[in-house]
Each structure stands twice: as C-alpha cells, then as structure tokens.
Amino acid sequence: NLLTLNELEFGNEVVTMERFDLASMIHNMLRSMQVLFEQKDVKLVYDVQEPVYAWANEFKMEQVLNNYISNALNHVDGEKIIKITIQRQDGHVRAGVFNTGKPIPEEDVGRIWDKFYKVDKARTREYGGSGVGLSIVKAIMESMHQQYGVINYDNGVEFWFELDDKNEA
C-alpha cells in the first residue's frame, strides 16, 4: 500500500484511462466480499442492474472502492447497513458507499485523507488499519483529476467519487 501511495504521490506512474462498466465491477467486488458482510451480519443494499459506463483506470477504481467498502465494513454500526449507489448526473457518474454508524467528528473530516491519520485509534487497532487507505483514494482520484469526498449524516457516513460518464446519450 505504501509503495502504491508513493508512486501515486510522486507521479511515477502513468494512469491509463479506459471505458468500463462500473456497475458490473462493483457487483463482482461485492460478490467476492460476500462472506465479510455475512461475518459482520451486515445488510448490503446494491440494486444497480443495468451497465453504467465510466472513464477511468479500472484497476485503480477497484482500489478506491475496496478502500471505501473496507472502511464501511470496519465502521458499520447501529442498523448495520451498507448501501452502495451509482447515479448519473451532468456528464458524471457518481458512486457512493454509505454505512450506518457514528458520523466522523467535524474536526476530523478535513484530515481523514492525510497519510496515517486515524480518527479512532483504539478502534483502528481492533481491525489493524494502517491509516493509508483514504490517502490512496485521494492520490488515485487526484491522479485522474476527479472529485471525491465524504458526507456525514445523523445515522452514518457516505464516501463518494465522481467519474466522467461514458454511457451512450
């Protein structure tokens, strides 16, 4: 993970962009992670059926989604729901990973993208988080000049990103 982060931060890697089906990629990832959802007794909500094409590096976007979903699994609480959404809007495809649980404290929201930053160190020790996942997301999304972020809700947190829409008009 650190090697990946260093390569991205120092721009040593050429990012190859391609048209790919984001909906199918997410579906396949979730299928391969199914046992993790079952172990934590998490209700997964993802009901995108049709292809949704985006323009990005598919391998890098798998890393982004893997980090978002892993974070959701590590922090899900309360109703134990993880909901993944895809929306097309204004020439972009926006994907979100929401988990029920405690919102991120406002004073920490701006720092969660920093390398090695951990909001709850005691909780992070429980699952062995290194604090580089979201900084990798930041580096990947910035290398592709795309938007990403986090939204706090009363009942949880949503991490999101946007990619260029490559669906037929």
Indicate where each model-derived feature is located:
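Conserved catalytic submotifs in the C-terminal HATPase_c
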Residues: 16-20, 38, 43-53
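A residue-level detector for a conserved hydrophobic packing site
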Residues: 61-62
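Short helix-loop "hinge" at the ATP-lid/N-box region of the Bergerat-fold HATPase_c
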Residues: 72-73
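Short beta-strand/loop element within the Bergerat-fold HATPase_c
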Residues: 79-91
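Short conserved segment of the HATPase_c
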Residues: 104-118
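Short alpha-helical Gxxx[C/S/T] motif in the catalytic ATP-binding
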Residues: 128, 133, 137
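Glycine-rich ATP-binding loops of the HATPase_c
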Residues: 145-153
